[in-house]
A protein has these predicted regions:
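Auxiliary Fe-S-binding modules of radical SAM enzymes
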Residues: 98, 104, 111-209
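Conserved strand-turn element in the central/C-terminal portion of the radical SAM core barrel
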Residues: 12, 38, 44, 66-89, ...
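Conserved SAM/AdoMet-binding glycine-rich loop
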Residues: 1-56, 61-62, 68-69
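Surface-exposed alpha-helical segments enriched in charged/polar residues
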Residues: 20-23, 64, 68, 95-98, ...
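Catalytic cores of alpha/beta
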Residues: 16-22, 83-99, 162-164
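Aromatic/hydrophobic pocket-lining residues that form the small-molecule binding cavity
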Residues: 59-60, 86, 90, 135, ...
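Hydrophobic faces of well-ordered beta-strands that scaffold small-molecule active sites
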Residues: 5-7, 33-37, 74-78, 105-107, ...
């Protein structure tokens, strides 16, 4: 039978009307509810550049509204190698998701589809994509900043090769995954390793001194 209903939407399309319906369905059926929100990055300059049509405030509002309902989990989609973003943006995005208490994260590696605005920018040299090594570093930095209780359901994304001008540095997603996990193991890095910045962390630092 059905064990979960997952609704994927934009942060600026979440309202009490729809959340009430999800709450009622859960009450009648006992089925777990999940809302998937596409944030992509906490950098509002990048959100504007890629024409997302919403900012960080709408995402925060959506999460806080969903949090008022029991039995509705939150999954957030993030792209860590958007043009203009840096490792600092990956870190700050992770920290915001942690502070908001999201339950699930899906990481996407940027691919550039043919016949799109990004494709034109990429082919004309207006934008570049970071190296595979830099992406690995951003993913690991992101993972270190989120609690180990957050489920990470994806770390790479892809489309058919014929439809893309750039996708995963020409590598298969499973090879990238294996390389990433090996790098984390070799460097002693893991999810949640640096998740110690909430609950008045500065006060704790002062006390330790």
């Amino acid at each position: 039978g059905v064990v979960e209903i997952s609704v994927s939407t934009r942060p600026d399309c979440v309202s009490a009307e729809y959340l009430d319906i999800m709450r009622d369905i859960r009450a009648m059926t006992g089925i777990q509810m999940n809302v998937e929100l596409g944030l992509q990055t906490a950098n509002y300059h990048t959100l504007q550049m890629i024409d997302r049509g919403h900012g960080l405030a709408e995402f925060i509002d959506a999460v806080l509204r969903i949090k008022r309902y029991t039995g509705i989990s939150i999954c957030t989609h993030v792209i860590l190698n958007l043009p203009g973003d840096t490792a600092a943006d990956a870190k700050e995005t992770a920290r915001i998701l942690t502070a908001l208490g999201v339950d699930i994260v899906k990481l996407h590696s940027l691919y550039i589809a043919r016949n799109t605005r990004l494709c034109d920018w990429y082919e004309n040299g207006k934008i570049t994509v970071c190296s595979k090594e830099e992406y690995f570093e951003r993913v690991i930095t992101f993972l270190e900043q989120i609690p180990e209780t957050v489920a990470v359901e994806r770390m790479f994304s892809r489309i058919p090769e014929k439809d893309a001008v750039f996708c995963n540095w020409g590598c298969s997603w499973w090879r990238l995954r294996d390389e990433l996990l090996q790098k984390m193991e070799e460097e002693g890095r893991y999810q949640g390793k640096c998740c110690d910045y909430l609950n008045g962390a500065a006060l704790c630092l002062l006390k330790s001194e």
